[in-house]
């Protein structure tokens, strides 16, 4: 029978699931580091912790943290260090994300990029590696840091590319984390949007870069009215992502309450959490921690208003139904030896046609689409 692996992430010497949220404070969204309020951040983390969440994914907004090619903003670093301390105070961890150029429907360049290619411009690659090493050096020994992500959805920021070039870039970026002293698990943050899971050849192949990273992190948002696909596509992607032989972490998932009722949002979370567990996922990081109603005039929310309402808490910090589902799920897992679980063998399997990985000539995008 086909093997059905369930790999666990290992962080701080313990095999345990990550259950958390992607985090921007409601005081600023992507601009939180220039509008940082330590009291509100602690309040936001307290609510998450009280509902069973153990971690967040956090973001170094690139224009703020690297205002010049050879400069790290130490004020932003001081605020991030306080952010780490706030996690430690409530017993939570966080996964910092380095190259945050794309966020919620808009791309944000540092002023000095001037259109340089992130993967092939040697100077630009060196600047990214320096930036990652410098930030890692500052924070790698903080006990709240439990992992690292190179980017946020970089295929829609840096663009797609040749698989060999993308994988060489990934090798250098992961190497920059290790050069800075980071020993925690690391991955790319690319969304696992490669040909293996989508049928579209973006150049980000988990089969190729999988040997460089410690986990694969799908980002799954279903934007359609097919209920079966809505509820099961994330699990399908998790099954396909197992091909890399690494732990699969649901790095981003969620939905805007602009599009669904409170009851429907709870049902979606419940279905996704349990179906991806049975599909081999061993970590879940919801998008995102809060709504942003007070930022309606700020980009990207001014032009993508539905992005304001993916929160698992509202703009005042009150829990929404998805957070209650995360609490229940966390309680269920706390009474389970997740690391000791084995998925039941099955005589069924997913047949992945060779055209997805062989790049056969005269095959079209339509033929590969999943």
Predicted regions and their residues:
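Active-site mouth of glycoside hydrolases
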Residues: 2-213, 284, 293-294
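Extracellular glycoside hydrolase catalytic/binding regions
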Residues: 155-279, 307-321
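Carbohydrate-binding surfaces of carbohydrate-active enzymes
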Residues: 278-370
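Redox-cofactor binding/interface segments in oxidoreductases and associated redox assembly factors
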Residues: 58, 217-218, 350
